[in-house]
């Protein structure tokens, strides 16, 4: 199955509708044929705060601890903003780990922020980003969405 990750709920719904066919709605995603469509809610995943890293004294600000560089052990966590701790996080993570999920599509906005949102969600789930395909469409019209997905094949 192909997992499509959109940046917002409204975009996920528009994609599911454009894909056509019978759509089954679940908590945090829509299944349409061989496609699973899920969505973020803005910045679902952010870097952990310095004081959340074990083995470092980064909790108190001090010149002695600068620069703070967690490389290579970046830690990701679900964001604190309202609504971030919902089914979207659980479902996108679970959907990426399903045995029948064989490809990822980045349907977030084709800009820096959209790319960051997508990559952070995938990193938080602990799956490979190597085979992710960008959708590259900002439009919400069915014809434009269909054309974008057809050009990926």
Predicted feature descriptions by range:
Residues 1-153:
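Intrinsically disordered, low-complexity regulatory segments
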